[in-house]
């Protein structure tokens, strides 16, 4: 019997793979998220590898796996640490978050959980509220005062590109595809 011990913030499962994410909020300048990949085998579920990216994820919809590439969207908070930076996570150091320096990123990782493509620094000062992956497209909604919807083409995993940005009032916490090229935001 084998076990993998640790913390899990989110889980993404499909018929092609199982992924667990764990965000490290320790005293660093920014959060880091570790992703643990598991494969389905004749013996059951087996650990394959892990990777790490900057930031934290909103929920399981911030992750997707197409059978070859794992895609994930994160928000990165720039943090200022004052006091004893060597203290424990709940020790005497003070951490403040600079929302003006907050950015949002989308990463594409290969089967060994290494970053092969990325879009970084979207919507400075905002945070991700919802993400939806549909085929080779990613839809990312961020929020602070307006509600930008980013459309990202993932056709070339090594060179994902922002194809459009729509700014509308409010924000959507859930995106649902209803037809080719149409989304409903709730």
Regions from the PLM with identified roles:
Residues 1-186:
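Beta-sheet-rich non-transmembrane sensory/scaffold domains
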């Amino acid at each position: 019997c084998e076990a993998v011990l640790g913390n899990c913030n989110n889980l993404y499962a499909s018929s092609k793979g199982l992924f667990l994410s764990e965000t490290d909020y320790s005293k660093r300048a920014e959060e880091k998220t570790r992703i643990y990949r598991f494969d389905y085998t004749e013996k059951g579920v087996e650990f394959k590898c892990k990777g790490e990216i900057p930031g934290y994820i909103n929920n399981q919809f911030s992750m997707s796996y197409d059978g070859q590439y794992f895609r994930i969207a994160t928000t990165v908070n720039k943090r200022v640490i004052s006091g004893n930076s060597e203290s424990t996570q709940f020790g005497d150091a003070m951490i403040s978050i600079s929302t003006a320096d907050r950015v949002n990123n989308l990463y594409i990782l290969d089967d060994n959980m290494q970053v092969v493509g990325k879009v970084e620094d979207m919507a400075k000062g905002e945070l991700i509220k919802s993400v939806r992956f549909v085929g080779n497209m990613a839809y990312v909604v961020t929020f602070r005062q307006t509600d930008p919807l980013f459309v990202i083409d993932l056709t070339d995993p090594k060179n994902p590109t922002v194809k459009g940005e729509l700014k509308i009032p409010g924000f959507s916490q859930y995106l649902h595809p209803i037809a080719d090229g149409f989304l409903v935001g709730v």
